[in-house]
Amino acid sequence: MGNTCVGPNLNPNGFLQSVSAAVWRNQKPDDSIKSSKDESSRKKNDKSVNGDDSNGHVSSTVDPAPSTLPTPSTPPPPVKMANEEPPPKPITENKEDPNSKPQKKEAHMKRMASAGLQIDSVLGRKTENLKDIYSVGRKLGQGQFGTTFLCVDKKTGKEFACKTIAKRKLTTPEDVEDVRREIQIMHHLSGHPNVIQIVGAYEDAVAVHVVMEICAGGELFDRIIQRGHYTEKKAAELARIIVGVIEACHSLGVMHRDLKPENFLFVSGDEEAALKTIDFGLSVFFKPGETFTDVVGSPYYVAPEVLRKHYSHECDVWSAGVIIYILLSGVPPFWDETEQGIFEQVLKGDLDFISEPWPSVSESAKDLVRRMLIRDPKKRMTTHEVLCHPWARVDGVALDKPLDSAVLSRLQQFSAMNKLKKIAIKVIAESLSEEEIAGLKEMFKMIDTDNSGHITLEELKKGLDRVGADLKDSEILGLMQAADIDNSGTIDYGEFIAAMVHLNKIEKEDHLFTAFSYFDQDGSGYITRDELQQACKQFGLADVHLDDILREVDKDNDGRIDYSEFVDMMQDTGFGKMGLKVS
């Protein structure tokens, strides 16, 4: 399955998240992420095969903290997640050398609710009628712009996936161009064994239909979890496939810009099934020397130069490096309790090769990852150099022994929690407003055991202890000081609400009560296992490790999830200060 060295050389949890939401880290001027009121980014199209929208996309609205923390009258500005938010407006600032080549300016416009454009043709050509060739079957998934159906070729009986994009949802000329470009790129990359194959594109009066091969073998992480074990050698094989796809894209002038494990699916459940790269909704064509400014991607995987709004194809190598780091350790290299914190870590954080399981990982593997995650894109390894690295080569030095079992456990939690949040994100519509504050008030009361209206350090310690957080006193004190804006020595109700609302803003202003009510179908005030299973079934998500989710989220062990526990889960990025604990 792997690629050889060939090709062109193109140069824990619970209340921890509730409190640490108030951590607004200082930034040095040259490393800060400049905010823009109207800028944000999102994935334009739903997953092309399984119909899942990607969650947790990067937006460019990241506000650095001041050097001191005055008492604000309103919550800090939000960091919005891109897959449900409007695309970025054009970048007008240009601080480059005027003699340098112009930067790519994608004319994204803020999406407004409308009946859509009067579109004569998206594809620019007359096509056959989809239903004359295919029988359209059950829905596989629903996305922001399109719905994915199973379709069957009437002549051969072969199954495919068909993504149908309603024209009325294409509200700007840029939306139309995005659809055209994605189809063009899929055709451009057609023939590569590890790129999803487009079969055809069709258009009628109301929609565009993109027919492609169906990938029914599940996501990359899920396959690893199902097998129960894998070796460093297998990780190297997967790395070759991932980087080989990137090299092929770059050699054809395509930058993916949204590489992450969820965008790699297996064609079938067979042991030797091909791994395919999917979803080119954020991909663009690029020319040598061309730079881009729009902030796109997903938080854990986004490259630092993307956050700084000056990047090119090297950003894909960084994302691949993050994926390989996760394949070897089970956790992402840069994480925090908030998305802004994740961005800070991407820009400045240190790589951890000390914690388990890294002592048992080969030095060659660590060398490769380290060189793929160099922040200076010009010093970062190229795809060709990665494929030629001793660890990544087909006959390379990757160890043929099982990786630490903790890796599998961490991958399982990481994958499962993301999927549940995906469902919740899909069903959120309008603002929680009053309902959201009511939920936070109950959370505050739960920690403020003496009902004084202030959370003391001792109450915070006990609250964290109740949910099993394993933190040093110095770390808890650090959280306390970060949330205590007026330096009173306690966290008052206003500070707590400000911190929590800020975190909800980071979650795309998620209206959590709406999502909770979706799961709580009988209105009991609790989400049961059966309700979770039914919701997952409705969204086509099988084997989502429901028992693991309940164990992680159900803090009082009553076998169900109440609203407070649900809020904790939604605000948890998955990794506490000490990493995921494995029993």
Swiss-Prot record:
A lipid is attached at G2 (N-myristoyl glycine). Keywords: ATP-binding, Calcium, Kinase, Lipoprotein, Membrane, Metal-binding, Myristate, Nucleotide-binding, Phosphoprotein, Repeat, Serine/threonine-protein kinase, Transferase. Residues 134-392 form the Protein kinase domain. The keyword Ion transport does not apply. GO terms for cellular component: membrane. Activated by calcium. Autophosphorylation may play an important role in the regulation of the kinase activity. It is a lipid-anchor. It comes from the Eukaryota. GO terms for molecular function: ATP binding; calcium ion binding; protein serine kinase activity; protein serine/threonine kinase activity. The keyword Zinc does not apply. Residues 21-111 are annotated as: Disordered. Ca(2+) 3 binds at D520, D522, S524, Y526, E531. PROSITE patterns: EF_HAND_1, EF_HAND_2, PROTEIN_KINASE_ATP, PROTEIN_KINASE_DOM, PROTEIN_KINASE_ST. SMART domains: EFh, S_TKc. It is found in: Membrane. Its main location: membrane. Belongs to the protein kinase superfamily. Ser/Thr protein kinase family. CDPK subfamily. There are 3 contiguous domains conserved in the CDPK subfamily: a kinase domain, an autoinhibitory (junction) domain and a calmodulin-like domain. The autoinhibitory domain (398-428) inactivates kinase activity under calcium-free conditions. This is Calcium-dependent protein kinase 20. It comes from Arabidopsis thaliana.
